[in-house]
Amino acid sequence: MILKIKIKEISMLLCLLFYCSISSANEIFLSLKKSKVNVRYGPSFDSDVKYVYKKINLPIKQIDKKENFRRIIDLKNNSGWIHVSQLIRSNSVIATNDKILFKKPTSFAIPIALIKKGRLLIVQKCEKNWCEIKTDYFNGWIKTDDLWGLTN
């Protein structure tokens, strides 16, 4: 009897570990499609507006979904529900620390600019641990560490 209980407990633990590893590997980042996006308390147009984002391309993380709404969380841990028509696949990130933008994807390349913490960046493409990005004024390469919104 004790052996059956232990086997059952172990198998439940393995299932839980397997599920957690799958869910963390499948993080979904999206970006805001419009310059004004309502975030609601619930997954319905009948739900009250909790707050309004006013930043196009802002990256957000999807943590749940229900029909045509996605529950999201942002870099500052604000959360709520957004309709799918206001979201696009993520092509943007936010620098979580000051970073150097390089001309080529190597630390030995010519530095182009200092990217300040909190800066919104548009990702062109990624190779290994580097992403080619553009800002309002610069194009170049940046290391992928300390970027929020990047899918692995």
What is the predicted function of each stretch?
Residues S44-S47:
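Second-shell loop/turn segments in exported
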Residues I2-S11:
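Bacterial N-terminal signal peptides that target proteins for export
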Residues S23-Y41, Y51-I56, I63-K104, F108-Y137, ...:
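SH3-family beta-barrel domains
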Residues S11-Y19:
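Bacterial N-terminal signal peptides
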Residues I5, L16, F29-L30:
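Generic extreme N-terminus detector
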